[in-house]
Amino acid sequence: MQIFLKTLTGKTKVLEVESSDTIDNVKAKIQDIEGIPPDQHRLIFAGKQLEDGRTLADYNVQEDSTLHLLLRFRGGMQIFVKTLTGKTITLEVESSDTIDNLKAKIQDKEGIPPDQQRLIFAGKQLEDGRTLADYNIQKESTLHLVLRLRGGMQIFVKTLTGKTITLEVESSDTIDNVKAKIQDKEGISPDQQRLIFAGKQHEDGRTLADYNIQKESTLHLVLRLRGGSF
């Protein structure tokens, strides 16, 4: 029968197999086609990793089923890094890798300097010098990458439509400055913007620090139409 094999790069290959084939047999076929040694393969079907020695029939793999191929580097593991844009980066790492090492790998892939990267896992910011093992980061864990601009911070602005805008700001920025940044991103003129944080409307001329707005705070943007009464 025919089954499909999908790689992380999105490439799909067709394999000719029998239900009685073992996972070892399938990995040998993949080696013939792709040149990847079986000890570097992991095969996933219906969310389960397939074990050598078991057959396709054991896992109910049928005609036209799709298996997913993940690569396992000797002694290593794969983890995922999700960016604020929703993009997911796949990295090959070791448990003994430090957060510095990880940031260097992200720089290689994405071109983002390590000093602009903040990595979050299980709600905690990861510190340089600590290892993945220190944070109990295991295979296929997902980390979140937040960008830190030099000296600045990120805040979020949520609109009434539910859209969230990310802004790079300084604590010393005034509300006027923030409205100008929103105008640059969204095309909404400052005189139509009302910004709310912690239930208070922000006054032009005051700074983010005045309102105790810190990194990753969320402000709410309400539109004020010209001629409106508020």
Swiss-Prot record:
User: Which InterPro entries does the record cross-reference, listed alphabetically?
Assistant: Ubiquitin-like_dom, Ubiquitin-like_domsf, Ubiquitin_CS, Ubiquitin_dom, Ubiquitin_ubiquitin-like
The family annotation for this protein states: Belongs to the ubiquitin family.
**SS bond list:** none
Query: What keywords appear on the UniProt entry?
Result: Cytoplasm, Isopeptide bond, Nucleus, Repeat, Ubl conjugation pathway
Organism per entry: Arabidopsis thaliana (Mouse-ear cress)
One GO term (biological process) = ubiquitin-dependent protein catabolic process
Can you give the propeptide residue ranges?
229-230
Provide the function of this protein.
Answer: Ubiquitin exists either covalently attached to another protein, or free (unanchored). When covalently bound, it is conjugated to target proteins via an isopeptide bond either as a monomer (monoubiquitin), a polymer linked via different Lys residues of the ubiquitin (polyubiquitin chains) or a linear polymer linked via the initiator Met of the ubiquitin (linear polyubiquitin chains).
What the entry lists under SMART domains is as follows: UBQ (SM00213)
Extract the Pfam families matched here: ubiquitin
Tell me the CDD domains matching this sequence. Ubl_ubiquitin
Misc. comment: Ubiquitin is encoded by 16 different genes. Ubiquitin is generally synthesized as a polyubiquitin precursor with tandem head to tail repeats. Often, there is one to three additional amino acids after the last repeat, removed in the mature protein. Alternatively, ubiquitin extension protein is synthesized as a single copy of ubiquitin fused to a ribosomal protein (either eL40 or eS31) or to a ubiquitin-related protein (either RUB1 or RUB2). Following translation, extension protein is cleaved from ubiquitin.
| All residue ranges annotated as the Ubiquitin-like domain in the record | 1-76, 77-152, 153-228
Q: What is the lineage of its organism?
A: Eukaryota, Viridiplantae, Streptophyta, Embryophyta, Tracheophyta
PANTHER family (UniProt xref):
UBIQUITIN (PTHR10666)
Please, which domain of life does this record's source organism belong to? Eukaryota
Q: Name one GO molecular function term.
A: mRNA binding
Cross-linked residues for Glycyl lysine isopeptide (Gly-Lys) (interchain with K-? in acceptor proteins) are: G76, G152, G228
Protein name according to UniProt = Polyubiquitin 12
Provide the protein's localization: Cytoplasm; Nucleus
Sorted alphabetically, the Gene Ontology cellular component annotations on this record are: cytoplasm; nucleus
The positions making up the signal sequence are none
